[in-house]
Amino acid sequence: SMISDEWGEMLIRGWNDARWMEQPKRVGDLVARLIGAAPGTVVMGDTLSIKVYQALASALEMKPDRKVVVSDNGNFPTDLYIADGLIKSLDKGHVLKTPNPEDVESLINEDLAVLMLTHVDYRTGRMYDMKRITKMAHDAGAIVIWDLAHSAGAVPVDLAGCEADF
């Protein structure tokens, strides 16, 4: 078994000998097929919450002159807590706007740093047109983060075709 053979016998050598270091990429390639991403573009790790935090922190670094983050008030609560907490800890003047889902598009403009949305609403099943919304945000110069927790494997997703950022 993995525990007795790899962990018990190899100990720390397992990171190289059993290729543990490659696991995030190997599993990422399997998940990539579910979300329409190209091989080598998805890496698994930690938890979704940590990955949302890392993606948002990176996206804000990529747009240092923009201060607006838009989500929607139907987003998964943890995503909103993460965004709010990160914005407070950065203390760089960012603001999180959470309109009703039908009003999100009206906030996509040249002030937008990051658009952070959940593809499928976990309560209602409402689904954003990922390709159209991503294009709108990119045309405005913004970065887009999609939470696919309720989409992957349930509905067709084409991250590569949408040119999604995160």
Regions from the PLM with identified roles:
Residues S1-F166:
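Pyridoxal 5′-phosphate
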